[in-house]
Amino acid sequence: MFIVDSYALAVVFCFVTMLCWGSWGNTQKMAAKTWRYELFYWDYVIGMFLFALILSLTMGSFGSEGRPFLQDLGQASGANIASALLGGVIFNASNILLSASTALAGMAVAFPLGVGLALVLGVIINYAGAPKGDPVILFVGVALIVAAIVCNGIASGRMQKGAGGNSNSRKGIVLAMVAGVLMSFFYRFVAAAMDLDHFENLTAGMLTPYSALFILSAGVLLSNFVFNTYVMKRPFVGAPVSYREYFTGSGTTHLVGMLGGAVWCLGTAFSYIAAGKAGAAISYALGQGAPMVAAVWGVFVWKEFRGAGRSVGWLLAVMFLFFILGLACIILSGGN
């Protein structure tokens, strides 16, 4: 299997993760004009599962180091498979809420609040499980991310006040916060199933990053029959959606959703592959710089803060500054 052999390359992989995790939401925005997010989400999950399988059979199967994908699956212990599956179930619950929040409140609000909160809690959880890097610099970086989240929250609040507010936006903010709390836990369950210290000569019973990703995506797909079916019948906003409507979508519409799942899956694969050199906490934290990427898309491409006053513009500028400084601290923490 392919293995990252240097911290510098691990950081590059983490930046790719950040771009992927912060950009997949664009596919939802592209499909949202004619396609309910509950239907989009099925394509997203299918794309994620298929791309995880492709990565596992290619990058996860070639090379002289580590264990190839199929051999690794055959020797994995039940406890580690269950841990990765549980990570997929937790992620799916959080991501459905995040997708709903994006549909209600926009990318520039949902991602910084939801994923930013997941970053803070997730770094603490992952560092406690596998300490690596300078904790002082790491948590200074996390504190700066918290400051960025606060700026985003104030900016979105002023936007609502200026526009008279609406119940959908408020509901979207609440959903983003709940999603963030749930999302902070999924990575640890998957990381616990992997041998992060010995990718070249893995411990028996533990998983490679590729096998862990495949099992995670299987957990997402299986749990989607429960979670998304429930949301389709009892949506957060709008009328209930039927499975019959899913099959009325065009091929292009379905492919856009699958692309979103593939983009997220690529980012997650790179995060797990990088964790061997960077450590779970740092790999997770760098990837969760995604809110800044999503906010850039939301502010500059989708114009979600169009018409905002000068004070909102300053808050957004400070938010971006704090995110950049926070990410810099997280990178530095791994070199100490």
Task: Go through the PLM ranges and name each one.
Residues M1-N336:
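Polytopic alpha-helical membrane proteins, predominantly small-molecule transporters/carriers
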